[in-house]
């Protein structure tokens, strides 16, 4: 069922300005507005986002539909969880044991046609704003870095790992300062022995002393620039200082060193790329990185033969027991594995359950908001190639930590999983929830380059059930 139209805060400002409230574009008025709506300490101090891009099938995972039409039925049956009456599918046996720590939101949806594809859908998820329009909107992570700053003096406040696949290309700085831009670790396969962040080590041919001499020279040159004191120039200077600290501080390399972890724990997460990505996310949160996004996409390695495109875009043979590139498959089958294989839900289930338990054991769930998201779901109806296509009418995300009540299902979709029937939420609401959990005041505007007020998640409201 489509969500009723509501007047968003952005619309309200627009109507107000049309009615003569052009005072909002006045710098003094904006300053007063910002002072009135201050940020306050929130329950969350950090955020860890697991972005499983490609459009994960909700009816095969978090929202089982055993009573749907036979021709649409998932082969994966509902199973019980640690919470009576709360069910996942049998693709989540490990995660079902930590259900009492999770809030599963089964009523996500969006109705804008522009976000029905992966690039725009991912942008929508990363920013909490419908893509398009004259002003490019920044990632939630960049906004958080701008408003809250860094808790870790030697690493960027916003890190994406590995940040080298399709979804990472949709990350946007927008109009935020350069020092809030996401730092992407890179790395083809984090499960490789001795994996390190490319470019983080200092070039031995230069050395620390020579580097500092060059940076001092750069600083002296900057002083003479006419725009030295502009916000843009200051952002660049802060970004350079941040990069210098990351290069020279030995803690930086340790933060990314997965070999610091005991073998037993690495095994618990799973020794593949996905498990080690999730583990790195926990390590970065432990280093007080403010906002971490893990964007897993299994790489082509000897461990994943033929797997060149292992995200969740299962247009062809979604239930294949190996490769989806079977006779009759289209382009979506090439390089992809079935949803029930180890490389897909098998590794997700193990890694996510291990992550939640590990963070809970270390006390990190007390003040870290963990979000498991995808940009949309998949069609209730199987297509001719026995796959499921893009679907924005209903899908699921998961939250945990930072005071999120565990063991609850939020919202509902219909018998087929096609449309939301209860407590509909959008990516705008998801963004508003993240901001509110961090203590950011949604009424305190950001400023566009021309001074206009831009509200956080302007068309969203926090998901009330997680507070």
How should these model regions be labeled?
Residues 1-467:
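Ligand-binding pockets and gating/stacking loops
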């Amino acid at each position: 069922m489509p969500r009723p139209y509501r007047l968003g805060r952005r619309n309200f400002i627009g109507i107000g300005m049309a009615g003569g409230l052009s005072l909002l574009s006045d710098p003094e008025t904006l300053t007063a507005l910002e002072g009135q709506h201050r940020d306050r300490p929130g329950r969350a101090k950090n955020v860890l986002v697991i972005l499983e891009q490609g459009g994960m099938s909700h009816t095969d995972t978090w929202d089982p539909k055993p009573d749907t039409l036979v021709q649409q039925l998932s082969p994966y049956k509902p199973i019980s969880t640690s919470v009576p009456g709360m069910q996942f599918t049998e693709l989540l046996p490990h995660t079902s044991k930590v259900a009492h720590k999770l809030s599963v939101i089964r009523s996500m949806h969006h109705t804008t046609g522009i976000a029905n594809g992966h690039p725009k859908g991912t942008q929508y998820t990363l920013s909490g704003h419908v893509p398009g329009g004259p002003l490019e909107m920044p990632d939630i992570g960049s906004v958080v870095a701008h408003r809250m700053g860094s808790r870790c003096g030697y690493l960027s406040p916003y890190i994406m790992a590995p940040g080298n696949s399709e979804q990472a290309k949709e990350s946007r700085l927008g109009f935020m300062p350069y020092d809030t831009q996401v730092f992407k670790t890179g790395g083809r396969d984090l499960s490789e022995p001795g994996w390190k962040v490319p470019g983080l080590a200092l070039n031995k041919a230069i050395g620390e002393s020579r580097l500092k001499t060059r940076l001092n020279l750069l600083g002296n040159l900057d002083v003479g620039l006419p725009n030295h004191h502009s916000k843009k120039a200051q952002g660049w200077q802060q970004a350079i200082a941040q990069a210098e600290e990351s290069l020279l501080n030995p803690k930086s390399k340790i933060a990314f060193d997965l070999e610091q972890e005991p073998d037993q724990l690495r095994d618990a997460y799973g020794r593949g790329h996905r498990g080690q990505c999730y583990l790195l996310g926990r390590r970065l949160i432990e280093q007080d990185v403010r906002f971490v996004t893990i964007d897993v996409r299994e790489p082509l390695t000897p461990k994943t033969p033929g797997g060149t495109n292992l995200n969740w875009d299962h247009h062809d043979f979604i239930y294949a027991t190996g490769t989806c590139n079977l006779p009759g498959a289209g382009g979506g089958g090439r390089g992809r594995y079935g949803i029930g294989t180890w490389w897909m839900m098998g590794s997700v289930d193990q890694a996510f359950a291990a992550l939640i338990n590990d963070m809970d054991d270390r006390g990190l769930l007390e003040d870290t908001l963990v979000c498991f998201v995808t940009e949309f779901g998949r069609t209730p109806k199987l297509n001719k190639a026995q796959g499921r296509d893009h679907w924005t009418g209903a899908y699921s995300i998961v939250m945990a930590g930072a005071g999120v009540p565990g063991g609850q299902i939020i919202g509902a979709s219909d018998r087929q999983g096609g449309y939301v029937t209860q407590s509909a939420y959008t990516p705008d609401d998801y963004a508003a929830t993240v901001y509110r959990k961090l203590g950011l005041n949604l009424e305190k505007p950001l400023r566009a380059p021309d001074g206009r007020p831009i509200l956080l998640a302007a068309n969203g409201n926090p998901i009330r059930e997680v507070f």
